[in-house]
Amino acid sequence: MRQIALVAFGGAVGSVLRHLVGLGAARLFGPAFPAGTLAVNLAGSFAMGLLVEVLARRFGGSPDLRLLLATGLLGGFTTFSSFTLDVAALAERGELGLAFIYLAASILLGLGALFAGLALARHLA
């Protein structure tokens, strides 16, 4: 039960943060491009890389922290289902070029952000 509570609490916080980032991105960039989803997925990828390395080095891979932060917080913060819906919406509006740019940017920059998080954690260790 404790593990479920850790995931639930982290997920609730992550979901609220995702919503706030989405609102802010819509105000800054407008609704034409899913900047909020891109931002949370890139930030989440970076944070996941940083977190995995820090947990391994400083906390011995603590299962409780991993459940709270990786599964809960970052699971609630990032969103693959919204990402795929955004790609489909752009494509269905006939904006295939923008859909491809968003798809490629999300995947490539997401991987880059993950590796940047790993590198930062290793540098700070």
Please describe what each predicted stretch is.
Residues M1-A125:
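Membrane-interface helix-loop junctions in multi-pass transporters/channels
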